[in-house]
Design a protein with these regions (language model features):
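Short active-site neighborhood of thiol/selenol oxidoreductases, capturing the structured segment around
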Residues: 51-66, 91
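C-type cytochrome heme c attachment motif
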Residues: 63-70, 126-129
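Positively charged n-region of N-terminal signal peptides that target proteins for export
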Residues: 1-4
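N-terminal cap/lid subdomain of alpha/beta-hydrolase-fold enzymes
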Residues: 71-77
Length: 181
């Protein structure tokens, strides 16, 4: 009897462990969500226009940010998120503490940390910033989203031009009400 109990307990713990370790599994966001760049955002704007994208998304992050890690492990790694964002935007990361030189939307060479702090007023991470095809920031979200659905809604909000007419809070409320119907 004790032997059966030990076997059942061992199997249960094995199943529990495998469930916990695979909870955030998905596609590597650095490979399947973010686009590669040489750091010339003026050139990336031209690429976005040429590819008929709605704009550019920049994910401002830093290494030891738990909310950035959450987004990369639970949202940006999901195939449906990757498919939607890759179809509609060019997506890039900027390290807010980085000393790597980049070229901003106007063609000025600057460091990542200066682009984040001085030009985009990033004080906390993550910041998800959307830019139109002329390089104007059109929407900004600070912090993690509540999950996959909210992040996709954020992209739809920008892609369909709703940001011109309503707040993202109202947009989400309308989406939730539509879901209930």
């Amino acid at each position: 009897m004790l032997r059966h109990y030990v076997i059942a307990l061992t199997l249960s713990l094995g199943l529990l462990t495998s469930t916990v370790t695979t909870a955030g599994v998905g596609n590597d966001p650095y490979k399947y969500f973010f686009n590669e760049t040489w750091g010339d955002f003026r050139e990336e704007l031209a690429n976005a226009k040429q590819q008929n994208k709605k704009g550019i998304l920049i994910f401002f992050e830093m290494d030891e940010c738990p909310f950035c890690h959450y987004m990369k492990s639970n949202v940006l790694n999901q195939p449906e998120v990757q498919a939607f964002y890759r179809e509609n935007f060019l997506n890039f990361t900027v390290d807010i503490e980085g000393d790597v030189e980049i070229t901003n939307m106007e063609g000025k060479v600057t460091k990542q940390k200066d682009f984040a702090f001085l030009e985009n007023r990033v004080r906390a991470t993550p910041v998800i910033a959307f830019f139109d095809l002329d390089g104007n920031r059109i929407f900004r979200h600070t912090g993690k989203t509540s999950g996959i659905e909210e992040f996709i809604w954020m992209g739809q909000y920008v892609a369909d031009g709703s940001y011109k007419e309503t707040s993202f809070t109202r947009y989400k409320r309308n989406k939730r009400e539509e879901k209930k119907k």
